[in-house]
């Protein structure tokens, strides 16, 4: 994926149910920052010049993560999603990454079935937490 793909990818994201977009992280600037930090790892799938699938993929030097995995519903069940995942996994492996995670909404039945189908393991032994950091709450972490 290149930043030039952003408009088509963003339009695709808007068509996917069970998907969440954040205005800051998923802005063009946010995605460009992510792609610069993780060059050559994210991927798009194209059919006749149209982007029909995308994965934002990156790592922190220790663990990999897949974000915003999506395939246009009209193009599903053709192996596009699996091919994109294989691309990302190979790219991460070349970077020395040996463990990869992702987050899927509990009620995203299509997505959850896909991950199980291609051999991913759903973790039952941990809780997932996040914290939306902004200028108003950063003071919690100042001494």
What is each residue range found by the language model?
Residues 46, 69-76, 104-105:
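A short, internal acetyl-CoA/4′-phosphopantetheine-binding micro-motif in the GNAT/acyltransferase core
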Residues 102-111, 130-133:
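Conserved beta-strand-loop-alpha-helix junction that forms the acyl-donor binding cleft
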Residues 85, 92-104:
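Conserved GNAT acetyl-CoA-binding A-motif
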Residues 1-11:
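A short beta-loop-alpha structural element at the N-terminal edge
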Residues 44, 50-58, 65-70:
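Conserved beta-strand in the GNAT
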Residues 58-67, 76, 123-126:
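A conserved beta-turn-beta hairpin within the catalytic core of GNAT-like acetyltransferases
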Residues 68-71, 77-90, 117:
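Conserved acetyl-CoA-binding loop-helix of GNAT-fold acetyltransferases
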Residues 20, 32-44, 65:
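A short helix-loop-beta-strand connector motif used in the catalytic cores of GNAT acetyltransferases and
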């Amino acid at each position: 994926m290149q930043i030039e793909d952003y408009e088509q990818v963003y339009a695709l994201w808007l068509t996917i149910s069970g998907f969440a977009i954040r205005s800051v992280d998923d802005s063009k600037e946010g995605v460009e920052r992510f792609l610069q930090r993780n060059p050559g790892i994210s991927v798009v799938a194209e059919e006749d010049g149209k982007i029909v699938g995308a994965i934002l993929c990156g790592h922190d030097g220790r663990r990999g993560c897949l974000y915003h995995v999506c395939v246009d519903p009209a193009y599903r069940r053709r192996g596009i999603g699996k091919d994109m995942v294989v691309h990302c996994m190979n790219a991460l492996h070349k970077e020395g990454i040996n463990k990869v995670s992702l987050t899927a909404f509990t009620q995203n039945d299509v997505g959850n079935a896909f991950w199980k189908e291609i051999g991913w393991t759903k973790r039952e032994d941990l809780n997932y937490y996040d914290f939306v950091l902004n200028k108003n709450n950063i003071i919690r972490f100042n001494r």
